[in-house]
Amino acid sequence: VKIGAWLATESVSLLSSLVDSLLDAGSSLINLFAIYHALQPADREHRFGHGKAEALAGLAQAAFIAGSGVFVMLEAIDRLFNPKAIDNGEFGIGVMVFAILLTSILVLFQAYVVRKTGSIAIHADSFHYRVDVLVNIAVIMSLMLSSYGGFLLADPLFAGAIVIYMGFGSWKIAIKSLDDLMDKEFPDEERIKIREIAMAHPKVHDIHDMRTRRSGRYSFIQIHLEMSRELTLVEAHQI
């Protein structure tokens, strides 16, 4: 539908929405594979499981978003210096309203899934569709200003703003994915909570060498516990 709307209007802001939607479809397929792989149980060669497949998918999505953003930005710059009137603006606006309704339903469902699972891949995918909603709103404003207000520069300016937002989202997804891949430690407040839980045991005198990391939706915590030397090895192991 968006392809038809773009061909009818030749709007560069609508092109940005079209590219974003195509990117969303490709990213969702990547996520399907990544989540399936991440849910596979640990095996002999992957003792900590396969959770990092989600982070790899998130990193790939960040690259796709950045690449599509560069393409649209080049088109927007060309249209900025070569303004063009928008044709069939009403058709384009109708398509965008329809797209907003469908995408909003999907975003609400994905937000629910992310709260339940903490999936990086679905979080990245959800960002794509949230961007899609904002992009569609911006496209509607652009088409209205260009078609009815005679402000031809609205089209490339709105497209440029959309690309900047896409770039910011791409950066955030990339950082989150890299943190997971590089085994970044938990935030200080979470480490403090872990220490409090460990120290609450009456036979634990102190802890040291705490190490934490995440792999997909799984969290791993390693701690050295200091206990009385009078405890037997069996008792210490049970603690």
Residue ranges and their predicted role:
Residues 1, 7-19, 23-239:
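Alpha-helical transmembrane segments and adjacent TM-loop junctions that form the membrane-embedded core
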